[in-house]
């Protein structure tokens, strides 16, 4: 976060860092641009530690940079926290990402007389930038351009110098950075949430573009020093959307946001002629009909949305689909060409593993469609088209509403392809779309009856292993339920297809083991019967079984049954997921973990 303007810089910097806490961190620090010197304060631990260390009689300072760090090179200590400074203490740098060639830079700089005080890769940048600033006669922008040419890796950098403290210079490469335009003040941050209280005017920054802000101006240059046009856009949500709104945690608020988020993602995407309308795809009818295969690429929770996409696309559009883990994708030899459509799913639009996979797919000639929740982020910019979900800001690290809107988005893509390829009739497409329109109310119905579920959950607080079973399209839901419990409550949890029980996982069942089974819908009768058999298998071995089942479905052998509204099989993941989110949330609260910022996790994973 960087600020320069008329007000005391401490306030927007600390408030901005607080809004970025959801991204995860283990230390925090600031550098304030006092004349002829810099005030540096940094502390390991939470932002409150930094605030508590600031002197009460601080003079008013009008510019500065602030940072929250996840340890990569060097442990989470005061010494390794950012900002890092040159040996004169007049230039400070903060950094997200990884500098891959920092060791060779450090050796070169030490040989020329620089002294290092930390274990980080970032400190090499501070010393290098200081040397290059002297070579460029005090021009920090020119020095930053020269510095970037020496660096390998993925990074965002901000720098400030005591000789010109109201000027802040930044650059990004494969890591997020955005500028904010205020009234006589300007901002730089890794996320617009940091400055949303002050302005809704933002400026998009591209790869290797060097941005310089002063109180009255924002300028952007390429690495050759050529000026670039500002690409301004308006932030479409307000500060209230990033507040808890009376809920105990952001995650709980975001669970209750889901009916509106789903509705907002659906609105306006059906034409007056009852056709799915996705002009955002930027594909002709012939191009959609020529698709031979689809690869869905994602990480974490978004990967589970991709698994749901496979069922929907193959069922409705009759196109073969592979679902790929982004971090693995480019390290094998994926079959992808000009007849392939690659769907890249990301909440943040900045996931580094996914960005690298997108670039790999594009280099092979594939068309890339991003499904994303964050406007003007990197993955949508580098894709051929983007379908934005409209979940609003998701602050809790564990994804909830973004996940459900990703599923709804891939339903829309599936129906559009089916419509164009005529694998479904117009009437079938219309009926499915109208059934989707019922999903917000059905999710609301689940949330209105949440209290018995919360009470039930407390009976499982002491279980240290929970197994989730699903069949067919409910298998991704089982995986998501297990992931949520791992993320939030730090409990060993696994998701399995019900049919795989006898191939190994049933050995884990002992007296008192918690098993959550998701019963398929009545229109999947064969799977429904199989899952009921699985329930009997684990119950016979002492498991405590909770079943998520559609209203009216017969359930035998369960200790507890959680009812959800009836819907078609392919839409059931949206409804079956909600009780699992609540289950994980309540277990985490009861066990006293940090629900919104679980240990070791970051909201946006911007390094490989």
Question: Language-model features: where?
Answer:
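C-terminal interaction segments
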Residues: 92-96, 255, 599
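Conserved short alpha-helical segments that host acidic/polar catalytic motifs at enzyme active sites
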Residues: 1-249, 260-292, 331, 444-447, ...
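A SIS-like phosphosugar-recognition module
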Residues: 163-164, 173-177, 183-184, 202-246, ...
């Amino acid at each position: 976060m960087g600020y320069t303007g008329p007000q005391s810089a401490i306030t927007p910097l600390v408030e901005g860092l607080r809004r970025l806490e959801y991204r995860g961190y283990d230390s925090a620090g600031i550098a304030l641009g006092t004349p002829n010197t810099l005030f540096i304060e940094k502390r390991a631990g939470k932002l409150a530690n930094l605030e508590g260390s600031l002197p009460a009689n601080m003079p008013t300072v009008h510019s500065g940079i602030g940072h929250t760090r996840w340890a990569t090179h060097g442990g989470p200590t005061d010494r390794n926290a950012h900002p890092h400074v040159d040996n004169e203490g007049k230039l400070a740098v903060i950094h997200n990402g990884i500098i891959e060639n920092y060791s060779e830079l450090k050796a070169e700089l030490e040989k020329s007389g620089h002294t290092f005080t930390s274990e980080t890769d970032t400190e090499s940048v501070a010393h290098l930038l200081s040397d290059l600033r002297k070579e460029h006669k005090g021009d920090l922008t020119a020095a930053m351009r020269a510095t970037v040419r020496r660096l390998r890796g993925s990074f965002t950098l901000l720098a400030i110098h005591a000789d010109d403290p109201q000027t802040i210079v930044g650059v990004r490469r494969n890591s997020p950075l955005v500028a904010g335009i205020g009234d006589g003040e300007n901002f730089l941050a890794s996320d617009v949430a940091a400055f949303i209280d002050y302005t809704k005017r933002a400026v998009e920054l591209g790869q290797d573009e060097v941005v310089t802000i002063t109180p009255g101006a924002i300028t952007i240059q390429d690495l050759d020093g050529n000026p670039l046009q500002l690409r301004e856009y308006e932030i479409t949500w307000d500060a209230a959307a990033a507040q808890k709104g009376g809920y105990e945690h952001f995650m709980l608020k975001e669970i209750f946001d889901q009916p509106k988020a789903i509705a907002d993602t659906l609105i306006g995407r059906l034409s007056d002629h009852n056709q799915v309308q996705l002009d955002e795809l930027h594909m002709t009818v012939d191009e959609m009909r020529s698709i031979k295969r689809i690869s869905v690429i994602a990480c974490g929770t978004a990967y589970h949305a991709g698994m749901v996409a496979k069922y929907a696309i193959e069922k409705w559009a009759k196109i073969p689909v592979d679902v790929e883990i982004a971090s693995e994708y480019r390290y094998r030899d994926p079959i992808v060409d000009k007849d392939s459509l690659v769907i890249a799913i990301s909440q943040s639009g900045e996931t580094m593993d996914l960005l690298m996979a997108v670039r790999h797919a594009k280099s092979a000639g594939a068309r890339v469609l991003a499904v994303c929740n964050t406007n003007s982020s990197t993955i949508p910019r580098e894709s051929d088209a983007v379908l934005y979900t409209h979940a609003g800001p998701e602050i809790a690290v564990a994804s909830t509403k973004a996940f459900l809107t990703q599923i709804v988005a891939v339903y829309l893509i599936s129906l559009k392809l089916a419509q164009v390829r005529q694998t479904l009739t117009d009437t079938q497409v219309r009926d499915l779309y109208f059934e989707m329109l019922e999903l917000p109310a059905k999710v609301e119905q689940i949330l209105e009856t949440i209290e018995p579920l919360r009470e039930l959950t407390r009976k499982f607080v002491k279980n240290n292993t929970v197994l989730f079973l699903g069949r067919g399209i409910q298998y991704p839901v089982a995986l998501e339920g297990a992931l949520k419990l791992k993320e939030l409550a730090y409990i060993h949890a696994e998701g399995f297809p019900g049919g795989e029980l006898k191939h190994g996982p049933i050995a884990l069942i002992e007296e008192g083991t918690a098993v959550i089974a998701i019963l398929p819908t009545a229109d999947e009768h064969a799977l429904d019967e199989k899952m009921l058999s699985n329930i009997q298998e684990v119950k016979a071995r002492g498991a405590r079984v909770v079943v998520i089942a559609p209203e009216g479905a017969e359930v035998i052998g369960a200790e507890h049954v959680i009812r959800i509204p009836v819907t078609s099989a392919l839409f059931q993941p949206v409804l079956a997921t909600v009780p699992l989110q609540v289950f994980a949330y309540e277990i985490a609260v009861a066990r006293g973990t940090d629900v919104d910022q679980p240990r070791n996790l970051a909201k946006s994973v911007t390094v490989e």
